[in-house]
Amino acid sequence: MSNLEASLFQLKFAAKSLNKQSLKAAKEERAEREKVKKAITKGNSEIARIYASNAIRKQQESLNLLKLSSRIDAVSSRLQTAVTMRAVSGNMAGVVRGMDRAMKTMNLEMISQVMDKFEAQFDDVNVQTGYMNKAMGSVTAVDTPQEDVDLLMQTVADEAGLEFNQNMNNNLSVPAASVPTPAAPVEDDNLQERLRALRS
């Protein structure tokens, strides 16, 4: 295993470990929130405040761990690109050397075999290039355009929108839209006098 590959393994392991720690902190945050609810229900405001502080701290801890995991994952993706492209370059160099020998001897069978390898190697390069372009375009939130992040958040919110709206309606008292009430009819003395005059 080369130094690059060893570093890549360590980075991937670190990112995975940090992600697990982030999930653990998020789970602990939810537990602290439940404690807050119970403390408030029992009327223990001071204890609820302590649990709330713990929940906020765990939330921030989870977020920081997730950010660091994302940054490491971004670096490992770039390192994966270097490892893969180096391997492809080495294979291409071997094919080129084989082609030089084939051309010098003008051995048609050897030339045909080398060309087969050459074309296959280019196919591998195209596949790897496509993969790397995709990976480099979306490896981490650090490099992701803000509008993409906003769009993803909106999509997730839309998917959970029904449940979220129901919860909001249950917990919040939203004033109903004001509907204008028709004004009470006001008698016009002059109009009434005219109507009576017409009838007589």
From Swiss-Prot:
Which Gene3D superfamilies would you find in this protein's record? 6.10.140.1230
Keyword entries, A-Z: Endosome, Membrane, Protein transport, Transport
Q: Which Pfam families match?
A: Snf7
Give the bilayer topology: Peripheral membrane protein
One cellular-component annotation, GO? ESCRT III complex
Q: Which InterPro entries match?
A: Snf7_fam
Which intervals of the chain form a coiled coil?
A: none
Q: Where in the cell is it found?
A: Endosome membrane; Endomembrane system
Recorded superkingdom: Eukaryota
GO biological process per UniProt:
endosome transport via multivesicular body sorting pathway; late endosome to vacuole transport; late endosome to vacuole transport via multivesicular body sorting pathway; mitotic nuclear membrane reassembly; protein transport; ubiquitin-dependent protein catabolic process via the multivesicular body sorting pathway
**What role does it play?**
Class E VPS protein implicated in concentration and sorting of cargo proteins of the multivesicular body (MVB) for incorporation into intralumenal vesicles. The lumenal sequestrated membrane proteins will be targeted into the vacuole after fusion of the endosome with the vacuole.
User: Subunit info?
Assistant: Homodimer.
Stated family: Belongs to the SNF7 family.
Name of the featured protein: Vacuolar protein-sorting-associated protein 46
Instruction: Give the encoding gene's name.
Output: did2
